[in-house]
Amino acid sequence: MKNWPRLAFIAWVLLRQGMDQLVLSHMPHASLRLLARLMSIGRTHHEPRGVRLRMALERLGPIFVKFGQVLSTRRDLIPHDIANELAKLQDRVPPFPSDVSRAAVVQSLGRPIEEVFASFDADPVASASIAQVHFGVLHDGREVAVKVLRPNVLNIIEADLALLRVAAAWLERLSPDGRRLRPREVVAEFDNYLHDELDLGREAANAAQLRRNMGGLDLIMLPEMIWDLSSAEVLVMERMHGVPISQIETLRAAGIDIPKLARDGVTIFFTQVFRDGFFHADMHPGNIMVSTAPATFGRYIALDFGIVGTLDSRDKEYLAQNFLAFFRRDYRRVAELHIESGWVPASTRVDELEGAVRAVCEPHFDRPLKDISLGQVLLRLFQTSRRFNVEIQPQLVLLQKTLLNVEGLGRQLDPELDLWQTAKPFLERWMNEQVGWRALLGSIKDEAPRYAKLLPELPRLLHDALQAHARPQRPSDELLLALLHEQRRTNRLLLTVFYLIGGFVAGGLFAHWILPGLLHLL
């Protein structure tokens, strides 16, 4: 295997940071636990485990940094100290040369850069592991931002993914938990996730959808995508001018109403969630500016659309009813909602789940309503749900992470922000739209054309259903099992992170101590 040097380096980094002790000590094999104790002799680590894991991931490069960033959002799965530390991971790397950027743009455009751009800044304004951004001006005078994929990034990622596959294979051999979690399938899913990020055309489509959705809301601005100049490798968009939202004193000096700005951010988020079911899922301060231009004074400016979340009506109903039941302290209804969702095993007792929900939610009411964190409420519900083998939906985990970001930013702008008072009208409006005669008539109107087409086929469909019921097999059960299997796949991705580290350690030890002897015998 040509990647043995890289595998050995990964194992060395993990060993140096004491990750072997963290993983091997939890392995079921006594020999591996003994190995962990022997390898810890003579080594002292003064930093906490979360710090050591973060430092190891930073040393190992972009794919591991991204894995850590994703893992940091799963506070329902990992200890808080590790999640807090991984949240500090920054995807920043030195820029690549401007002539390489220009060459990539020329290749994407299929013509000299001078034919399209009146000017193209040599120095990038931002640089990350996947891409970097340059400013430029088109010949028609439009100012643009040009996002260019890092050269050879695909090969770099493929090399590390190959090693992840090796680690996953070792994991399946070493650990019963590893076999249960199907790490090779998990690595394949992470592969898909990374390749989605490498497609700038997908990011452009996300931006266009958000811009269209937000068109009637005068609280936010999003850049226009310039489709005829963009591709999967190069994204050209309107350049946006504003003040970074983290520069609060600068915004205050410019005359921005800071408390209103905080409320507007919450309004934007809940509009995206409950009206559109499509939300920007990377709303940290680095991706937000505020306009100070007279015509758009005080509006949010959103950037970077690589991560978005999608919610269907079932997700929105789950959220709205859970929040409303929580603030009414109706914990039985919260428990019933979890069971009605179908994500809880059918054998779960409502009263047991109700008691667990009460235990984690009631302490929140020791403080004023304005100080209650909706993101923390969701997090505690997810943590409680895990004890009852609830399959936490990935889109809801993404929303919970984004909600924490929005809350954090809002309270950074205005410590007195009452998130509940801002969110409550959205929840109540959505619930009112889903019940009553108006909602029923709207549903009938929307579904009437489809049902009209089905009416002539009704006898055949009824006959097929009766025939299927008479068969010994249960296709509906098989379909249900397949759907449940799909829901579990994303959670397995992050449940295996520490076991993958164990696979790397074992692979590195094999490469360093065992493989040379085998080669010598051959």
Curated annotation (Swiss-Prot):
PANTHER family: CHAPERONE-ACTIVITY OF BC1 COMPLEX CABC1 -RELATED, PROTEIN ACTIVITY OF BC1 COMPLEX KINASE 7, CHLOROPLASTIC
Transmembrane regions listed in the UniProt entry: 494-514
First-listed, main subcellular location of the protein, grouped into a coarse class: membrane
Classification via SUPFAM superfamilies: Protein kinase-like (PK-like)
Keyword Transmembrane: yes
EC class (word): transferase
EC number from the UniProt entry: 2.7.-.-
Gene Ontology BP annotations: regulation of ubiquinone biosynthetic process; ubiquinone biosynthetic process
Listed GO MF terms: ATP binding; protein kinase activity
Domain of life, source organism: Bacteria
Function: Is probably a protein kinase regulator of UbiI activity which is involved in aerobic coenzyme Q (ubiquinone) biosynthesis.
Binding site for ATP: 125-133, 147
Gene transcribed to yield this protein: ubiB
Key words of the record: ATP-binding, Cell inner membrane, Cell membrane, Kinase, Membrane, Nucleotide-binding, Transferase, Transmembrane, Transmembrane helix, Ubiquinone biosynthesis
GO CC, alphabetical: plasma membrane
Descriptive protein name: Probable protein kinase UbiB
InterPro entries, per database record: ABC1_dom, Kinase-like_dom_sf, UbiB, UbiB_bact, UbiB_kinase
Cellular compartments annotated: Cell inner membrane
Protein kinase domain boundaries: 119-496
